[in-house]
Amino acid sequence: MAYRDRTGLYITFRQSYSHHGQRLELSGWDPKEERQSLVHKDNKDNTVIEMDMLAPRWVTVEGEIDSLLLNTRRNINLLDKQYAKHVLPSFSDKTEQENEIQRLTIQITQDFQRCQKLLQVTKAQTNSATGSEALMAKNFLSNLASRIQTESAQFRKKQSTYLKKLRGLNANISPVESKLDETVSDVAISQSTIQQVALMEEQGEDEQAIRHERAVAKIAEGIIELAQMFQDLQVLVIEQGALVDRIDFNIEQTQVHAKSAEKELIKAESHQKNTGRLRFICFLILLIVALIVILAIKLLR
């Protein structure tokens, strides 16, 4: 390993520092006086500098949730590729693909659950907030809940489509089925899949088929967990919707007041113009009267 000897340079710096230290001592510089001039012991002499209010500690949770959601998006992209490979007809063993699908599914579900847990902890921390901070916390949590809900709903839809393909169901939803609650439909299919695995185990069917159905059941369990989390987050999203409705109402009222103020301003402007004309007319009348008086005085003389 190559290196350079810097001992000489270090000695030069040390000697230079000693030289400057002696010069400062000769000039009468006292470090204690310098410290006293910078830091006052008397609180009366201290100048209070007003600092900006720091952001609440719970705001930092947004970065953690963003990181988790970014990780879920990456894993979902990988999972989509595995789904596409697995549904292709093939006579080869797909155990490795099924294990990878199961691993990614569990990891994505756990990331969404971590997001929900962070949201619950943050909500507990903001319960003591009052005034404007409470309003800000409510809007902040509602926004995060909406983002988590959107991401989890998209993932649940992908899982449901894949599960229907595995179960031999039609993944394309008909117009009649689209009117039904998708969450209830997905949960019903998932529960049916789990019950079918239990029935196959009781009947002692082929181990290979049972193992395949267990992998499918894991996906079904993930759908049920995400559906439950979706319902929990819906409460915060509804609160955000109510808040948005109130904001829209306030905006509409502001527009009404602005139009009313514009009308009043137009009236005031017209009154001001009329006042100027009236003053000019009065001035002309006074001028005419003055001229008549002057003319009358001249005639009398």
UniProtKB/Swiss-Prot annotation:
Cytoplasmic topological intervals: 1-279
Functional summary from the UniProt entry: t-SNARE that functions in transport from the endosome to the late Golgi and on the endocytic pathway.
Protein name: t-SNARE affecting a late Golgi compartment protein 2
Vesicular topological domain: 301
Annotated Pfam families: SNARE
Coiled coil: 92-120
Segments crossing the lipid bilayer: 280-300
Family the entry assigns: Belongs to the syntaxin family.
Lineage top rank: taxon: Eukaryota
Keywords: Coiled coil, Endosome, Golgi apparatus, Membrane, Protein transport, Transmembrane, Transmembrane helix, Transport
SMART domains to which the protein is assigned, alphabetical: t_SNARE
Location within or outside the cell: Golgi apparatus, trans-Golgi network membrane; Endosome membrane
